[in-house]
Amino acid sequence: MEKMYHVGFDDTHGAKYVILPGDPGRVEKIAQFLDEPHFYCQHREYTTWLGKVDGETVMVMSTGMGGPSTAIGVEECYKTGVRTFIRIGTTGGIN
């Protein structure tokens, strides 16, 4: 498989789970709660780290701001084998 155009990685990561903060600055902080955290990839607004939870590979990837960049990140992660998406962070549009 070729690398995904926007997120910058292919399917060799082995993760089926991804935690999705919006801010790239939060990715490393979140990854430190995983076992064996390590930097994986950075392309555009998508900063990605990998780690383990109970022996399973878990990805932490920023999505940038807004729905369109989140949709692109989710779609490209799905194409690489990720099947569970956990969004964490704030919601700016609620009154």
Regions found by a protein language model. Give the residues of each.
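Metabolite-binding pocket within alpha/beta catalytic cores that recognizes anionic/polar moieties
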Residues: 1-95
